């Protein structure tokens, strides 16, 4: 059901809100201290990328978004004047994206949520930039033929951007743009013997990914974020499709339930992470709007496996770390109201804090990234303090 070498034993530690608050403040303080207005932040050795990245996933856009979010939440204070940094960040992001996109077989003209300019424009909209909304709208409207049917490079990320832009601007045009993408996405949903699925054309190959970053769960998450904009027929289709696909691809065992990263001839899963495996499936799809007894049983089985597997050895981060896995527990607590899930989320939080502090000592520095670094953990700790389940940039922006 999982690879034990990818996990560590959970050392029991009593949940301590003061410890969580202190970790958030330390993370924010370190990020502010390590910031350079021209070079941004150095890359972490474990990320294997050049210094000064400007994207959302593991670059300056993600760190600045998190720093702004944590300040809005009232859990971190820092001196960064984020709105003044955004125009240059947009330029740097676009220049970097034009250089890296072809290496992933992505056309540089295509917008990307996790690596491109989409989140930077969203931040500029929030900061009151007069032209950013039109810029973002045009970028998405000009790319309604995206070949990537997923969140990182494709429709799902841009659909989330429409939802967040609408919440800030109050403009109806974002609804229409969301629905144009939703229609294209649902038209490409294929009925197969493994349930309704999408085929992702990524990195020069066709794959039917299931997870929230590259696959099925991420597409459904985006559709559900615009739920009130969908008509009754599309809502009914989603309610039918999600349990059908999760049931058809679930791997059940005594330890719980897992899902493979993709539909293939060898579906035995070993990954238990947000990006691939049970935690991400639970976090993306534990939603009251599609809840039902069969789906809930599967999702709780995924949560049980996540708990039994234990914290991830890769560290405290969101994408493939302990913090990201903990969101599955927060989502199940939100869905079911059962306190056991909140207690488990907070147990993972204490473990993740230990991992963060140990890694900081080992490397002599922090890890400056949203999806793979310390500020993502800070966002998770804030949710554990609140008892809520908002995954950064997927549920809240």
Annotate the PLM regions.
Residues 2-17, 61-77, 119-130, 159-171, ...:
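Well-ordered alpha-helical scaffold segments within catalytic/enzyme domains
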Residues 21-40, 81-103, 128-148, 177-197, ...:
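Long, well-ordered core segments of solenoidal/helical folds
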């Amino acid at each position: 059901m999982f690879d034990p070498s990818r996990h560590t034993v959970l050392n029991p530690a009593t949940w301590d809100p003061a410890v969580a608050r202190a970790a958030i403040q330390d993370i924010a303080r370190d990020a502010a201290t390590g910031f350079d207005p021209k070079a941004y932040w150095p890359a972490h050795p474990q990320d294997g990328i050049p210094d000064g990245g400007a994207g959302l996933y593991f670059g300056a856009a993600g760190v600045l978004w998190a720093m702004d979010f944590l300040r809005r939440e009232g859990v971190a204070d820092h001196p960064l004047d984020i709105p003044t940094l955004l125009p240059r960040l947009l330029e740097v992001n676009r220049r970097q994206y034009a250089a890296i996109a072809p290496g992933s077989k992505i056309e540089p003209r295509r917008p990307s949520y996790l690596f491109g300019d989409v989140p930077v424009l969203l931040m500029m909209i929030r900061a009151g930039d007069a032209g950013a909304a039109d810029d973002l709208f045009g970028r998405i409207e000009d790319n309604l033929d995206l070949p990537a049917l997923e969140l990182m490079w494709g429709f799902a990320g841009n659909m989330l951007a429409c939802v967040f832009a609408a919440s800030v601007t109050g403009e109806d045009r974002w609804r229409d743009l969301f629905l144009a993408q939703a229609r294209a996405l649902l038209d490409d949903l294929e009925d197969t013997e493994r349930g309704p699925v999408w085929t992702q054309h990524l990195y020069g190959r066709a794959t039917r990914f299931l997870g929230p970053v590259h696959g099925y769960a991420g597409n459904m998450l985006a559709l559900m974020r615009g739920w009130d904009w969908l008509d009754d027929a599309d809502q009914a289709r989603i309610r039918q499709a999600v349990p059908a696909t999760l049931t058809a691809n679930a791997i059940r065992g005594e330890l719980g339930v897992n899902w493979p990263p993709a539909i293939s001839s060898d579906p035995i899963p070993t990954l238990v992470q947000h990006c691939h495996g049970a935690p991400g499936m639970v976090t993306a799809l534990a939603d009251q709007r599609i809840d039902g007894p069969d789906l809930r049983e599967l999702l709780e089985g995924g949560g049980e496996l996540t708990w039994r597997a234990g914290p991830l050895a890769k560290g405290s981060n969101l994408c493939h770390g302990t913090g990201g896995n903990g969101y599955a527990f927060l989502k199940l607590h939100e869905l079911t109201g059962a306190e056991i899930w909140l207690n488990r989320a907070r147990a993972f939080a204490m473990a993740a804090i230990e991992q963060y502090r140990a890694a900081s000592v080992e490397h002599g520095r922090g890890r400056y990234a949203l999806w793979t670094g310390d500020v993502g953990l800070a966002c998770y700790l804030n949710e554990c303090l609140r008892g809520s389940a908002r995954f950064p940039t997927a549920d809240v922006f």
